[in-house]
Amino acid sequence: MSYSRQYLRFPSRILGREMEMLHFGHQGYPLICLPTSNGRFFDLEDRGIIASLSHHLEQGYLQAFCVETLDWETFFNRKLELPQRRDQWLLLEQHWVEELIPYVRDEAQNDFLVVAGFSLGATHAVNLTCRHPGLVRRCLALGGPYDVAALGSITGWDPKQAEQELYFINPLAYMSNMSRQLWDQLGGRNTDLKLLTAHHDHCLSDNLRLSEVLNRNGIPHQLEVWEGDHDWPTWQAQIRAFA
């Protein structure tokens, strides 16, 4: 390995704790990496995603920041009622926008921010990108489910209630009402949004549906459907190709 690896901790006033991350590379644009559901900041290294980016890291094209998503405190926290889970996620998003992203940009000394998410991490990446157009310059969403209200089988919430309570963090819902004019006005004109899925990905239909919504509303994006599955080998190949 000829690229640097750092374990970092930094205080979050918003969350009231220290947050952990891994930082790989020495120069290039910052790539924030969001793990799969209930994943940890070290999972993407363990699963070969960082190794897949070795050439990019060695050549100084990018720096990867693997961070926490705290799914067990938000979407999967069955001790909380649905509105409380939503509010916990919104608090996490506030941390990303106001603390994490400025910290990462400062560490990388580069403002061209790219976010990559895997499975539920892709849902977070799309939410961060689409709820804050212009903040993220490129979004790589790999194998994500985008109908958040329909995740009741793994989260325990009622889909009907979730349709109302989670509207503003449910990409398939709120992007249905996002016009191209509003998208551009909010800063999305220069956003490069890529939906990356595979023929045997169980989230394929959500990717097709979201792409259809974006096409209908004239919002630029790229949909890639590869041979493969909802699995690490597919994501390793895709992140290598598009990062």
For every predicted segment, state its role.
Residues M1-A243:
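Non-catalytic cap/lid and distal C-terminal segments of serine-dependent acyl enzymes
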